Amino acid sequence: MKKIIFFFLTFSLLAACDDFLEESPPTGLTSDKLNDLVTMRALNNGAYKNFREFYAYATTIPSLAIGDSFMLPNDGAGNYIQATTWTTTGFSQVLTGNMYTSAMSAFHNVNYIINADLTNMAGTENEKNAVLGDAHLIKAILNFTVDKFFTRNASGNSFPLLNTVVGPNEKVSLSTSIALRAQAETDIELARQYLKQSAGVNTYMAATAFAAKIYFFHKNYDLAYELANEVINSGQFSLESDMSNIYLNGDTSTETILTIVTDLTDTTPSNWGGYATVNFDRFEASKSTGLFTLNPYSLVAQLRNADPSDLRFTQLFEEKDGFVFMASKYPTNETDQIIVRLPEMYLTRAESNIMNSNSVTSTDVADINVVKNRAGAADTITGTPSASAMLDIIYNERSKELCFELFDRLLNSVRLEKDIVDQNGSTYSYGDYINKLYYPFPQEEIDYHNFEE
């Protein structure tokens, strides 16, 4: 399989392991019994399950913060207001607890696997490689994401660096962005190494695509280009002709490379809808029950006005009751969470090549036109633009293609130090927002661990 999948299994081992790592060891399940590959897979599955909550609000909050979304005054708006007042107060702790606590649980699971003695466990080398590949990919995604959300620009301090299992009474300290970035790169390369030998829940190509994302946002454009190129040239993925099928099909879409798949057939109390439920409810195309509409002051709205026939707007956005809704990216409450898909690889390959050479090639133009042509865009590129003009084109293209998918618009604006807007259309420069748009730690964690930011 090519995607990250949540196995919402009902067998008792997974439930027990998940509880063990998140709370205290239940009777009869102690560390000396967590010593076989079946248990290691169960721990990975528990970490996959944590992703549902980890990414639950990773689209809604950033889209408000960057001004892409406008919030309706309906039920559920209360806490989200905190994401629109960052200009004066920064982000509120009420917005960030889910990501912090679910990350800690997932780190706990995968660090147990990585530090376990798999060599002496029964099983083939391929089976062990698959388990380790899954664990390192999960850990790479976690470190990449917490760095982007929890790092304080002024000090460089960030989320704790977790490479071992943290005991129930053990304290941790803050790490740095530099350390988290280095660890993400180490883990993604280990994931690629193990998954190349044997696919687990994830595959080598899924890890390679996420590696391209990591290096791109770390501004290592040589490696970003190389890995995006490898994914594209693998021939394993192709663009959908009907864009709505991407989100309806999710994991089975021909262009999705790395996806978190949800299965709500599990009815255990801990199984809530997470990202699927949150995004379906919040982006619902209803003036009375939906919550997020397109902010008319946003860059995305301006791009839509400039080319209203673009299929990314006609097939995925809906005008209704005087608002523009983005419901088609989250068509059901079981929608899969797409992390990487093929268009991002084309955009990454082209931009990385230009960043490296400060020049534009015909291949760069072709990469962007592949994405534009699929969308029926009116502004396909002719000739060879200058490097600066082409980078502007790619920024706009990435904004159209990946808006309201996780947090790409926010991360990309920060990477390029672009201006953003608020709900009312006021413009904020990079200097205005970079020391405010970060996630605070939960107060109880600050108090217990004596975090000094």
Q: Model regions: which residues?
A:
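TPR-repeat structural position
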Residues: 181, 221, 359-361
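Elongated scaffold/linker segments in the mid-to-C-terminal portions of large proteins
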Residues: 230-359, 367, 416-453
